[in-house]
Every structure is written in C-alpha cells, then in structure tokens.
A protein has these predicted regions:
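Short alpha-helical elements
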Residues: 1-301
Length: 301
C-alpha cells in the first residue's frame, strides 16, 4: 500500500505529464469548423484517474468496484475531492488509455544496464471450459500454450534489467510465438549487451540478427542440439533468469494484471497498463547483484 506522500508524488508526476501531453496534442489536432463542440472538461482530471487506477494494484485489492466505493470514496476523499460515481469512472477509464501508455513508456521504464532478461507470461481471460462460449474478446484473444499447458487469452512479453526494472513490454494474442516481438526493432530499442532467455527463444536466424544489432542472446541448449561453449559468466546469468519469473509473479499476485472478469477490451488494457505502472512505483523490486572486477586481463576468443 502506498503512503499519502507516495500518492502525492505519483499524482505530481502524472499531472505534469498530462499537462505537457495535452499541450503537445493540441498543436497537432485539426479543428472541426463545421460543428460546434462544448469541450467541457471532466470533473476529474486525467491525472486523478490514472492515480486511482495505479493505486488499485498496490494494496492487494481484487474487486475494483469495492476498492473505489469503500476505499477511495471513504478513506481518500481528502485526496480526491472531485470524485465521480463508479459508473462514470468506468467510462472515463477509456479516455486515459493513450496518456497512460505514453506515461509508462516515456517516464516509468528503467534504463538498460547491459544485462537484460526477456520472457512471456500468459494472461488468461477465461477458463478453458468456457472458450467456445466466450464473447468479450472474440476475435482478439487466441489459444496458446505455455509451460503450464493450454490457455485462452493474451501474452505479456517483458524485458527487464538486473535491477528488476521493466525496460519494455508488449501484448500479443496467445498464439504468437515468443520470438516474434524480438524481430521488431521498436521492442528492442535501447537494449544492448546480453539478453538472457529460455529455450523458447532459440533460433539461429534470430541470434544472428540480434548479434548484428549489438545484442547477445544467451539461452540454454536443448537436449537434441549440439553443445556449444559458454562462458562462466553466461552460465551464472542463466541461473538468475528466475528474476523475471519473480517479476511476473508480482504482477499477478501483488498487482492484479490477470483476472477473468473483464467486460470489454478497453477495461482489460486499462487494468494491465495500470498494473505495470504500479509495479514501476514499487520501492522494492527483485534484483541481482552484479559486480564487475577489472583485472586487466585480456580474453582470447
């Protein structure tokens, strides 16, 4: 649970960003001179809506309606004096999807340190028994398979550094190969050095393409593959790949990035983005201690 000082800090960051975002957005908008628009501002600002969405994932809440009515409206009324009804708040969620996405991408993501970890985690939208009658994500969610078996929903692809900070993320349907996001340059923007992954990312063409872009893909070897030499440092880093599994666990258990009660796709995106934003504000993140010793010894390849 965030303290009031932390909530104020998050609000100041979100409010400063929303003001700059609105200023830049108005410069490129085309004015509609045929019809008149009232342009009446909402009672709650975009920053307040973003903060309330983020706070939901910091306190272990599981029902957003109960959280908004029983916690925000009763215990945080001094921080949010211009509250709206729950139904109106759900409608306003859609309006902050774009600024919330850019806020995460431009402000909250970490910095690459040269050691990164990549992995994907499934986001179930319903039980497997209900796949054929599921209508909310019809045409969007797909069947996929992970280490835990078959599922129906989406995949969250994450890249983190050795400090547990999220460097980039991407949502795809459940049937997309884990290697597909790595083939897109935007997903690997500002990523350099070693990129540790599991056996699902093995691919000679992918390894060569990443190596030409300054990224060394480090994976284990499958049983039916010819063994290859690997440095001790790479072997140690592969043992620490559980770091990104811990990040996925915190997103699903401390935050609530995965549940099967979504009523629309926009609600799913708002919940997922706010969970990632809440994780970025966690003071304690899973991390590994990496120390480099300069022994002035040359390595012969």
């Amino acid at each position: 649970m965030f303290t009031e000082s932390k909530i104020t800090e998050i609000y100041c960051m979100a409010d400063d960003f929303c003001k700059e975002f609105s200023f830049q957005q108005e410069k490129y908008m085309i004015e509609d001179k045929k019809t008149g628009h009232r342009n009446k501002p909402n009672r709650m600002s975009d920053a307040e809506i973003m903060v309330i969405l983020i706070l939901f994932h910091s306190g272990g809440f599981r029902c957003f309606k109960h959280y908004y009515k029983e916690y925000v409206c009763k215990h945080l009324e001094h921080l949010f004096p211009h509250r709206v009804s729950y139904n109106r708040f759900v409608e306003l969620e859609k309006e902050v999807l774009l600024p919330l996405t850019i806020f995460i991408k431009k402000v909250l993501l970490g910095t690459c340190t040269g050691i990164s970890f990549v992995d994907s985690t499934p986001l179930h939208v319903c039980r497997n028994q209900r796949i054929l009658i599921h209508k909310t994500f019809e045409g969007l969610a797909e069947r996929g398979k992970c280490s835990m078996g078959w599922f129906f929903g989406f995949k969250l692809h994450l890249i983190i550094n050795d400090k547990g900070e999220i460097l980039n993320f991407m949502f795809t349907p459940g049937n997309v190969d884990d290697r597909e996001p790595l083939k897109q340059g935007k997903f690997l923007k500002n990523i350099k050095g070693k990129l540790c992954a599991d056996k699902g990312y093995i691919g000679q063409a992918l390894f060569e393409n990443l190596f030409l872009n300054g990224i060394q893909l480090v994976t284990k070897v499958k049983n039916n593959m010819r063994n290859s030499l690997m440095s001790i440092a790479d072997r140690i880093l592969l043992r620490k790949r559980a770091l990104i599994e811990t990040v996925n666990d915190e997103l699903k258990n401390i935050a609530q990035i995965e549940h099967s009660r979504h009523r629309s796709f926009s609600n799913f995106i708002a919940n997922s983005l706010s969970a990632i934003a809440a994780y970025c504000f966690f003071e304690k993140k899973p991390a590994i201690e990496v120390n480099f010793i300069n022994d002035r010894q040359l390595t012969i390849f």
